[in-house]
Structures are given as C-alpha cells and as structure tokens.
Amino acid sequence: MGHAEIETKFGLNSVMKVYTVSDLHVDYPENMDWILSLNSTAYLEDILVLAGDVSNDLEDLIRVFNSLKSKFKAVHFIPGNHELWVEKDKLNSSLEKFEAVSGLCDSLDVELRTVHYEQLSVVPLFSWYDFSFGQPDRHLTLAWRDFRACSWPAHLESCADVNDHFLNLNREQLDISNEVVISYSHFLPRIDVMPSYIPEDRRRIYPVLGSNLLGEQVKQLNPDIHIYGHSHVNQSIELENIRYVNNAFARPTEHQIARKQLHCVLELDS
C-alpha cells in the first residue's frame, strides 16, 4: 500500500472521543479476553488509536482488528516491533512482514495512513530505534528478542538503517496542519518522556526504546498530541507545547505502570 497516502473521511463529524491503547500483547490470554470483551456499543462514535505491539501472529491481529472495528467508528494502527517478528513466519524479512501487516490493515479497513476527520487529523509516524538514546550493553544485546526474531534485508545493515527506512515513509506527512492534529508512533520520540523514577538498572533498555530523529519529525509536524507505545510505562506529559501520551496495556504483571484501560486523549464537540 502507499504509506504516504492521505485519506479524507467525510460524514464523521459525529466523532465524539479519541481513545488510545498500545502494547496489548494478546498472546497473554487475559489480555486477549480484555480486548474482546470491550463494550460493543459504548464507542461506536469514537476513534481508537492502537499504537502497536498487539501480536506477532497475523491470525491474532485479524481477531483483534475485527473485534475493534465492530466497536469503534475507526481504528488507527501502527506496527510495533512484535508485529515484525518473523521467526515463526514463512517470510523472508521483517520488511515483508511489515507489508503483510499493512495489507491486512488495508483489507480490514484499519487505518495505517493519515486521515482527516474535518477539524481533526490523525497522522501515523513509522520508525524504529537507532541507539540515539544510548548504546546497548552486552546484557541487552543478548536478551533483546528483536535481535533474533527480526530479519532485515542486506541493505538495512543496522538499526539506524531500519529507522531511516521507516522515517522516510513519514516525510510527506510532516507539513500537515488542522485545528487539532494527533500523531502517533510505536516507538518513543524522545527519552525524556520516561519518568524520572525509573530505577537505574531498568534504564539499560533505553537504547531500544526509540529515536531522536523520530522526535525531530514530531517537532516538525508539531501536533497537539503525540501518542506512543513500547515503553509499557503510562505517561501524559507536556514538552515544548506537545502533549505526549502512553497508554500501554502491557503484560498482566505490569499493574503498577499501566492503567489497564482505554484512555481518552480528546473529546470533540458534537
């Protein structure tokens, strides 16, 4: 699909609220049960921004997408790192997996491109991590599953190359303006969205959380709200006049850092 395409949705002036959640990780049965049991009538006039890491399994993605599409007026998605794992797939690379997930979104009418809802624009920003938040230590290099579960074509020799590839998909989106602009990514656009209370020994994961170059694109777009996932640490913080929001559902054990519910980031006038 053409990732730079922009779609205008007419007749959606009745959209009332924009909700977000990320990192559903529905390979945990209790997480799958939660998403499938969402109220079937409460959100029919609302938009959901689903900021990645639902599942690496395409069948699980289909199940989740079909359920959410029946409950929301529109569902916006962006693949996370888990969606691009290929260790159990018959695909040659994680880029092929990205295209497979993109095609799935297209076939199920899940939005993976910029959409304008009259006074509101919702803009996906693709990315990866590039070690601009720090260099991975030996422990992270050995433990981080992406380094084994993802496979990239030869021309993408480094994580920085992968990040550049995805950032290039965003370039035509960065001059979009509207009364309200919400952008979203899976990865973190700046490391200072992480709370100061994170213990030092947990910060060893920071190199694989996101990219300063993604942050530069967010600043260029200058949205009202930027939604991100990946860190599993819920957050809502304003930095340089942009509200950064994380509402990761996270793993079942991560109750202290995750709300475990949908989060409304915007309510529009009816």
Regions found by a protein language model. Give the residues of each.
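Binuclear metal-dependent phosphoesterase catalytic core
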Residues: 106-108, 195-222, 232-270
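Active-site neighborhood of phospho(di)ester-bond hydrolases with catalytic His/Asp-centered motifs
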Residues: 20-22, 48-53, 76-81, 113, ...
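Beta-strand-turn-beta hairpins that frame and shape the catalytic cleft
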Residues: 11-19, 114-124, 180, 238-243
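Short amphipathic alpha-helices and their capping/turn segments at secondary-structure boundaries
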Residues: 38, 62-69, 106-119, 166-179
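Glycine/small-residue-rich loop that forms an oxyanion/phosphate-binding "nest" at active or ligand-binding sites
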Residues: 87-111
